[in-house]
Each structure stands twice: as C-alpha cells, then as structure tokens.
C-alpha cells in the first residue's frame, strides 16, 4: 500500500483525472477494448490512478497478471465483488491491502471503498468515523453492489437502509457501484449514484428504468472523473470514444 501511495503522489504532479471500471476482469473482447480505451485516454491526458468497483477477476477471483499489464501504468485501487470473494486474500496481497475496505485521498477528493459481500455493520462503523474525520470537499463511496439500479440485479434495500442516512449526514457526493453490467446515472434526493458495470464482462439487458434514472446505456465503457476547482466532472466513454454520459457535481462551500 505504501508503494501505491508513493506512485500516486508522484502522479499528482499531473492533472487529477481518475479512471473507473467495474465487472471488468474477464477474458473477453469487451475487456480488451476497455483496456485499450484506458490506454488511449492515458496517452492523451495522463490518469492519476485507476479505481474499480469490483469483480476484478472472473470467475472466482484468481489474479490474472496479463489483464493488469494491459491497463495504463498507474496505481490501481480496487473495490471487491462477489466474483472476487473466493480468492479475496490473494487480491488483497496483490494490491498491498490489509483489508477490503479503506480510504484514499486524491487532491480535493476522498474515496471510501467498502466490501459489499460481508461484514457490513463493522464497515459502517469504520465509514462513519472516516467520514467524520475527512476534510475533503468531495467524498465518493465505491462498492460493488449498487444501492439503486435498473439492472437485473437491481438496487439493494439492505445497503440503502444501512448506508443512506450516513452518506447524507456527511455530505457524500457520489456513490459508484457495479454488479449490474451496464452504465447508469441515478439521482436520489440530490445524491448521485453511478452504476459502472461495463468494464468487460458480458453485458445483459436492464429492466425498465427506475424513477431515479437519468442516463442509461447497455455498453462496455469506462468512467472518468476529473477533480476540478469547481467540482467533480464525470463522463463515460464507450470503447470507440463515444460519450455516453456527462455530469458535474459542484464542490460544496
């Protein structure tokens, strides 16, 4: 983890632009295409780091170094999903992490990673303390299972009841998740949620959009986040570079 932090500090001398992928680590053309998109974007304007929302390696979590080598040469900070669970210990060791939940500061943004497969009550207690201690103007939560989604899995009522009051109380600006293999932006009482599960695994159709849905695409993609003085700019691109969605979250005063 110290080595990753050092690499991140070195890359902060450049623009603070993050790539986000989810449900990506499958031996498919989609994964290779998204990896090529990330390399292209990094060559155009360097990425500070890559973040994931889990399902990093299919089918049972065993690390595939070839997949990692095809990504841009920047630090990678993962969340972990249900497909990672059988080999979670291996991934924690590979990414130099002591546990599957942690926090990461990138300039004016602080990212909080949770493990949605197990141990949520203890993680909630940790998250509350971490959010209370955070001085970041922009707070982002990453986890695998979404709170809201129009996908076949759908949103988790358990996660909503456990986390929503906490997220609102501490001014979290964005929740990033995967699990459903599509792109979707939703807004629920002012809190933005993005499902970014199109990193390479097979796509599947969605249900009719839920009332909070603001943008939806069944496509492989990567999400990009730019930390700017005026706020957090987000945009999703498909492997051909086509813009699927764009949003701006203003920095809180």
Stretch-by-stretch model annotation:
Residues 23, 54-55, 81-82, 144, ...:
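Active-site glycine-centered loops adjacent to acidic/histidine catalytic or metal-binding residues
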């Amino acid at each position: 983890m110290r080595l990753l932090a050092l690499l991140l500090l070195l890359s902060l001398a450049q623009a603070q632009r993050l790539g986000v992928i989810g449900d990506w680590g499958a031996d498919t053309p989609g994964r290779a295409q998204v990896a090529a998109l990330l390399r292209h974007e990094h060559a155009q304007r360097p990425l500070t780091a890559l973040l994931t929302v889990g399902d990093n390696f299919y089918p049972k979590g065993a690390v595939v170094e070839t997949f990692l080598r095809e990504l841009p040469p920047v630090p990678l900070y993962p969340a972990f999903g249900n497909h990672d669970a059988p080999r979670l210990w291996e991934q924690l060791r590979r990414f130099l992490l002591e546990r599957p939940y942690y926090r990461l500061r990138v300039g004016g943004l602080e990212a909080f990673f949770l493990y949605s497969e197990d141990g949520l009550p203890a993680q909630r207690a940790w998250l509350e303390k971490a959010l209370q201690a955070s001085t970041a103007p922009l707070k982002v939560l990453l986890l695998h299972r979404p709170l809201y989604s129009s996908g076949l899995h759908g949103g988790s009522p358990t996660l909503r009841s456990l986390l929503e009051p906490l997220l609102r109380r501490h001014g979290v600006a964005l929740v990033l998740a995967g699990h459903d293999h599509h792109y979707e932006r939703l807004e629920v009482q002012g809190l933005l949620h993005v499902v970014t599960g199109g990193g390479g695994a097979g796509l599947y159709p969605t249900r009719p959009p839920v009332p909070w849905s603001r943008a939806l695409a069944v496509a492989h993609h990567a999400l990009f986040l730019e930390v700017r003085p005026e706020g957090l700019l987000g945009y999703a691109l498909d492997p051909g570079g086509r813009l699927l969605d764009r949003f701006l979250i203003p920095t809180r005063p």
